[in-house]
Design a protein with these regions (language model features):
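Ligand-binding "clamshell"
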Residues: 41-53, 66-69, 140, 145, ...
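Short, polar/charged alpha-helical segment
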Residues: 1-9
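Pocket-flanking alpha-helical
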Residues: 16-47, 153-155
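A bilobed periplasmic-binding-protein/Venus flytrap-type ligand-binding module shared by bacterial periplasmic
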Residues: 60-71, 176-189
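Short helix-initiation/N-cap motifs at beta->coil->alpha
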Residues: 10-21, 109-136
């Protein structure tokens, strides 16, 4: 940012409300912590006017091996652990559908639950657990779908350990990409455009890839 003539001041928050309040009030110019769906829901609930100034990264869910190691050879009746919260369960099911393991009802999309499974040829048993609990329970299941942040905390490498991960062009990623949020009308400010340009630069992409090893991925959409 300095090379572009801007001084960047960073303030850390420990909750998901204050960062939006200070941007809405104009006390701060932007925040970077939330995915676009959360921002839109926050606007709807709070009557705020936050907009997406730039799509920066996503944290892909991955399918990790437990008792079994080959998705293409999954046995009938296999148990797969999936997150039990609405958002991540839907993402998990969409990912498993992309791998050809199940078929969901038409239109299920990012609100899908296990009740939306239309075809389950391998008679997979889905066990719903709190997302943070799944990594330590991995040995108990044939496979598990794990969030990027919890995989990272558990020492799992999404690039080398996951059998499949969400990709940039998936519907789920488009809905859960982390963004630079600003107050409506400020998205074309020169400072904001400079910030987005820096965060989408090849240098920052390399930093993200080298640091997080696939658990956080630069968004290319």
């Amino acid at each position: 940012m300095a090379a572009k003539g801007w001084e960047l001041k960073v303030t850390e928050f420990t909750d998901y409300v204050q960062p939006n309040e200070v941007v809405e009030s104009g006390d701060m110019d932007a925040n970077y912590f939330q995915h676009i769906t959360y921002m839109e829901s926050y606007n709807e609930e709070k009557g705020t006017h936050l907009v997406d100034a730039g799509d920066i990264h996503y944290e892909p869910l991955g399918v990790y091996p437990g008792k079994q190691t080959d998705l293409s050879a999954i046995t009938d009746g296999a148990e797969i652990a999936v997150p039990n919260d609405t958002t991540n369960e839907a993402r998990a099911l969409l990912l498993l559908q992309e791998q050809g393991l199940i078929t969901l009802n038409d239109g299920a999309g990012i609100t899908a639950t296990v009740n939306d499974i239309k075809e389950n040829p391998h008679k997979i048993k889905f066990v719903e657990l709190a997302a943070e609990q799944i990594p330590r329970s991995l040995p108990d299941f044939d496979f598990a779908v794990i969030n990027g942040n919890y995989a990272l905390e558990a020492g799992l490498n999404a690039s080398t350990d996951a059998l499949a991960t969400e990709t940039s062009d998936s519907d789920a990623v488009k809905k859960y990409v982390n963004v630079i949020a600003v107050k409506e009308g400020n998205e074309n400010n020169e400072g904001i455009k400079a910030l987005v340009e820096v965060l989408k630069s090849e240098e920052i992409k390399k930093f993200i890839n080298d640091t997080y090893q696939g658990s956080v991925v630069p968004y290319e959409g």
